[in-house]
UniProtKB/Swiss-Prot annotation:
Protein name (database record): Large ribosomal subunit protein uL16m
Similarity comment: Belongs to the universal ribosomal protein uL16 family.
Cell location: Mitochondrion
GO MF terms held by the record: rRNA binding; structural constituent of ribosome
PROSITE patterns to which the protein is assigned, alphabetical: RIBOSOMAL_L16_1, RIBOSOMAL_L16_2
Pfam families: Ribosomal_L16
Top-rank lineage group of the source organism: Eukaryota
Length: 135
């Protein structure tokens, strides 16, 4: 599971995901990539599920780079608890994703395999994504 060992604060405000990503929109490591087409939040479970789906498709002799990291804690209060009495406990971790941000990079695989893996990962992520290759 991908989440930080320690953070500056235990709990964060919700914040908003809006705008486009200025940097982190070009491929740095692999030949193929998965880019987000909209801004949103991705949980660490979704990132891990997408990574597993991609690696399961490729088997061996392939390289995958995860370019997002879930570093923001999400809190929630237990069921049937009255309002007030402070902010809830940490429930999980999310990554804020902006439009145009690269989520995954792949290398040492064929184009058709990479496209199929991107489709599998898209079902896990919950955001609209775009597959593209290095040019």
């Amino acid at each position: 599971m991908l989440y930080p060992k320690r953070t500056k604060f235990r709990k964060y405000q919700k914040g908003r995901c809006k705008g486009c990503k200025a940097d982190g929109t070009q491929l740095c490591f692999g030949k193929y990539g998965i880019k987000s087409c909209e801004a949103g939040r991705i949980s660490y479970q979704a990132i891990e599920a997408a990574r597993r789906a991609i690696s399961r498709k490729f088997r061996r002799n392939s390289k995958i780079w995860v370019r997002v990291f879930a570093d923001i804690p999400i809190t929630s209060k237990p069921a049937e608890v009255r309002m007030g009495k402070g902010k809830g406990n940490t429930k999980g971790w999310i990554a804020r994703v902006l439009k145009g941000q690269i989520l995954f990079e792949m290398d040492c695989v064929s184009l058709s395999n990479a496209q199929q893996a991107a489709t599998l990962a898209a079902h896990k992520l919950g955001l609209s994504i775009k597959f593209f290759k290095w040019s």
